Amino acid sequence: MMTRKVPIIAVATAPGKAGVGVVRISGQGLGELVETLFHRSLAPRQATLLTFCDADNQPIDQLLAIYFVGPASFTGEDVLELQCHGGPQLLELVMKRCLELGKALGLVIAEPGEFTLRAYLNNKVDLAQAEAIADLIDAQSEAAVRGAARSLQGSFSEDINGLIEEITQLRILVESTLDFPEEEIEFLENAQARERLAAVKKKLEALQAGAKQGKILRDGIQLVLAGAPNVGKSSLLNRLAGEEVAIVTPIAGTTRDRVKESIQIEGVPMHIIDTAGLRKTVDEVEAKGIERTWEAIRLADLVIFLGAPNAEPGHESLREEILGALPAKCPILDVINKSDLIEGGLAVSSSNEASPLLISAKTGAGIDALKQKILHVVGWNGAQEGAIVSRRRHLDCLERAAEHIAKSEQFAANGNNSLELFAEELFLAQNHLGQITGKLLPDDLLGKIFSQFCIGK
């Protein structure tokens, strides 16, 4: 996909019936195809109402055609967009006819993300902006939409590029000193290198904090409700969802398989998974459900370990077993349900941060406190103004850059004797930051990133 120079075509709108469906074509020299399709030229950047005909010159649709002459287009190439009526069969016929008439030009069906890849390769967007297009389409909340839009406008890229520029200026000073050792100046003091490095570190830490919030906005939180049978996991799911999505009975072991529901808490997507109660069983179906419970726990971002006054014996040993299965850095939140059965109710709840949170899924008592606790535990700070969406890839690059900045601090502490190593660590930090916007990224990784996009994007 990285080296294809031929024109490409795809339906750019979602599959299914709709009022409008868009067929998009991109490539060099599409003026010839326009003439062949419509027997006339089109004024660039103007919508023209036209009749689209099949090979027998029979009308297929009346559509709007818009022709963008490169480089003044999304991809940087010539682009033709056909705004048709949105029937799947109709769009298929339009695609078929375009491919027939575009065969001489080498017109082929686009691969996933190929339009956006061409925009990136032609410097219309950087990699972070290209990813923001996909994130905008996949946004699960209003906050995620706004965050992706900021990234698409270049807010995240500007911060990254600004930090790269500061490191570049620091590297210039270091390397110029290495080139003229006879000057014997105390570079680190005279150039205020340590102060500059401290400023870079502070900005990088702020970027990391913002990116962590952005990943929560983009991906949401995989929240697993786990515990023994009959502690109220399904009741809690229903309470959080605001509707009855899971069957609730007094019979232990009612939930035999995972039940998943997505909600939002203060704009943060939460993917809640109700699981089969964990216990030893000879029931083959229940055992399969328990196996899937452990699978969900191993993939969780947060586990709510639910107990109740009437929980089966072995509560603490079960908790230890869950802790052993959790992924690294995955927190566990201890919650006691059915507080309405406890004498004094919520009054017995301790103010100790480590003590279990008391709730009642039946009455709703303590649910608001639970929601706030969830947000706190996953690291959401509630700051949505100016937030951007980010990916695991971005966090990894920022983390590696931070590691090299930390090493450069160590070499800076050694004075002029370690300037070469100081410069090398700055260079490596710069490289990792550059991978976020795509300035320094292997072609195979680029292909992997864009292959996750929709066809037509």
From Swiss-Prot:
Enzyme class: hydrolase
Keywords: Cytoplasm, GTP-binding, Hydrolase, Magnesium, Metal-binding, Nucleotide-binding, Potassium, tRNA processing
The organism's place on the tree of life at top rank: Bacteria
A Pfam family it matches: MMR_HSR1
Residues the record lists as binding GTP: 230-235, 249-255, 274-277
Entry note: cofactor: Binds 1 potassium ion per subunit.
GO cellular component: cytosol
The keyword ATP-binding is assigned to this record: no
Subunit structure: Homodimer. Heterotetramer of two MnmE and two MnmG subunits.
Function as written in the Swiss-Prot or TrEMBL entry: Exhibits a very high intrinsic GTPase hydrolysis rate. Involved in the addition of a carboxymethylaminomethyl (cmnm) group at the wobble position (U34) of certain tRNAs, forming tRNA-cmnm(5)s(2)U34.
Family of this protein: Belongs to the TRAFAC class TrmE-Era-EngA-EngB-Septin-like GTPase superfamily. TrmE GTPase family.
Protein name: tRNA modification GTPase MnmE
Organism whose genome encodes this protein: Polynucleobacter asymbioticus (strain DSM 18221 / CIP 109841 / QLW-P1DMWA-1)
Encoding gene per record: mnmE
